[in-house]
Curated annotation (Swiss-Prot):
This is Serine protease vicPa. Keywords: Glycoprotein, Hydrolase, Protease, Serine protease, Signal, Virulence. Pfam families: Peptidase_S28. Residues 1-17 form the signal peptide. It comes from Bipolaris victoriae (strain FI3). The keyword Hydrolase applies. The gene is vicPa. GO terms for biological process: proteolysis. Belongs to the peptidase S28 family. The active site is at S174 (charge relay system), D450 (charge relay system).
Length: 534
């Protein structure tokens, strides 16, 4: 009977012009699972330019883990590490992270694909401005869609786990979560469902809102001290005497920096460490800084109460001591560039000197240059000081022009090409919908105190307020945590993270079942037509 049905469906396909590779057909697994391929890697010949095939291809690396895979026709859990070399993120193939945990639940295989221009997946031998022209958002999205549609996975020789026959679930975090959302919006109907943790979907140039969740979640005594310190720094640098400016720079070991905006930026940088804190962490640099400012011997707790009135000079002195003894030493030297060598070298904080080796490092291993290209060209999201009407923990001397100046130095014009100097936040938001993302079978999660929340669908700065959850686009706000906490199984020690992960996995499982229900309905319609014709 099955053979009879298949023959007639193929005949119907010929009449209707339905290509075989998109037939909504899920055949029971006839090929046993190859247990010799529990994990491995492959190389996919990816198009350099999806709009011009003549440009050629490059080798895009991918890895897979079929430990929990149910065999041909079972789901594929798709992941890309985004702006990181894949070899540094292979743990996302395992059940120590959400992709592996979802695979375990739905009997799926995890496939991890490296992002173009990162790690081993290099279209060219160097990162010149001219060679980076093919690093665009549309090319990146097209890469992953083309991979899903055309790859021959070595563990699925029958092709029954092709996205037309089995559900592909794309899970992403941070930048890769934004790629998840933008793919669902711009190239739908390839992946079946999506999970986006900490996705920054709304691009902004002066992204002062970045530090707002930090101010809300950090120990409040530390917050008020930092606000007072940054206010003092800005006041001195904007209206103080030359002697006062030099004295303040020297107090923080930054006397070798010529520009005041570079100095102010350097003094603001430590607060960014807030976004790195995970619930399972037993130590965090951010809380070490707060302990130092408050002159405490034990770590700050998230419930630290507001105490006495701020003593600016005491807080400033404590911060300077921590900055010069714990934060600054080795900061520039760790980059490995000879012109930034020396334990107390601060020149990596100088963004205006075009002679620095880092600005001319075109090696394909230079991930910072690749990410700078993406930021300068497309995403912006530059962390700046808050408007004068709001308290700030980031200097107001740092604005979008501060970052644009650096973009021009890193990416000078070559062969009549340069970075997109006239890009605006509206360029991407008009294309993607920005904060107003409405999708199908996509789940968003964000941490309550994640700085990137301010660019997410859960942003309090969204014109209509945080987006409301729907059945097709569930949105989970995880209480009390920072960035992408739900991606790591170790964070399940936190009740709110555990509940969010369980809710998300249950939702993905339902969507996997929906795939087979919908495909069965479609197959039934074909079957009905076959029998009606006879």
């Amino acid at each position: 009977m099955l053979c009879y049905l298949l023959i007639h469906i193929l005949c119907l396909q010929a009449v209707l012009g339905v290509p075989y590779d998109v037939l909504p057909l899920r055949i029971p697994a006839l090929v046993p699972k190859d247990t010799s391929l529990l994990s491995g890697r492959g190389a996919f010949q990816q198009l350099i330019d999806h709009t011009n095939l003549d440009v050629g291809t490059f080798s895009q690396s991918y890895w897979f883990n079929t430990t929990y895979w149910g065999g041909p026709g079972s789901p594929i859990i798709f992941y890309t590490p985004g702006q990181h070399a894949a070899t540094d993120r292979l743990h996302y193939l395992t059940d120590t992270t959400l992709p592996g945990l979802v695979a375990k639940e739905v009997r799926g295989a995890v496939v991890l694909v490296e992002h173009r221009y990162f790690g081993e997946s290099q279209p060219f031998s160097n990162l010149s401005t001219a060679n980076l022209q093919y690093l665009t958002l549309d090319q990146v999205l097209a890469d992953f869609v083309h991979f899903a549609r055309t790859v021959d996975l070595p563990f699925d020789l029958s092709g029954q786990s092709h996205p037309s026959r089995a559900p592909w679930i794309w899970i992403g975090n941070s930048y890769s979560a934004a790629l998840v959302a933008w793919t669902e919006k711009l190239i739908p109907n390839v992946f079946w469902a999506y999970y986006a943790s900490g996705a920054m979907v709304n691009c902004m140039q002066d992204f002062w809102q970045f530090n707002y969740p930090t101010q809300q979640g950090m120990p409040q005594d530390c917050r008020y001290s930092l606000e007072a310190i940054i206010s003092h720094v800005d006041s001195v640098f904007l209206s103080g005497s030359p002697e006062q400016k030099h004295r303040l720079k020297t107090r923080f070991g930054l006397q070798d920096l010529d520009r005041l905006d570079d100095t102010a930026s350097a003094l603001s940088r430590p607060v960014i460490a807030w976004t790195l804190i995970q619930p399972s962490d037993t130590h965090a640099q951010f809380f070490e800084m707060c302990d130092a400012i408050g002159n405490l011997n034990s770590s700050w707790s998230r419930g630290h109460k507001v105490g006495s009135e701020i003593n600016l000079q005491k807080a400033l002195g404590n911060y300077a001591n921590w900055f010069t003894t714990s934060y600054l030493p080795g900061l520039c030297e760790s980059s490995g560039y000879s012109d930034w060598a020396g334990r107390n070298n601060v020149q990596c904080l100088d963004t205006a000197n075009p002679s620095w080796q880092a600005f001319h490092d075109l090696a394909v291993q230079n991930e910072d240059r690749v990410w700078d290209w993406m930021i300068c060209n497309f995403f912006l999201l530059w962390q700046t000081g808050a408007p004068v009407s709001r308290p700030t923990i980031f200097s107001r001397l740092v604005d979008s022009m501060y970052y644009k100046r650096r973009c021009k130095l890193i990416f000078p014009e070559e062969e009549n090409v340069t970075y997109a100097a006239r890009v605006t936040d509206d360029s991407i938001n008009t294309l993607t919908g920005g904060w107003n993302h409405t999708g199908k079978r996509i789940l968003f999660t964000n941490g309550e105190f994640d700085p990137w929340r301010s660019a997410s669908v859960s942003s309090v700065f969204r014109p209509d307020g945080p987006m409301q959850s729907t059945s097709q686009q569930p949105i989970i706000l995880i209480k009390g945590v920072q960035h992408q906490a739900d991606m790591y199984v170790r964070n399940r020690i936190n009740k709110d993270v555990r509940e969010a992960m369980d809710t998300g996995i249950a939702q993905i499982s339902r969507w996997v079942l929906d795939f087979h229900v919908e495909k069965s309905k479609t197959l039934t319609q074909y079957t009905s037509q076959v029998y009606c014709a006879h």
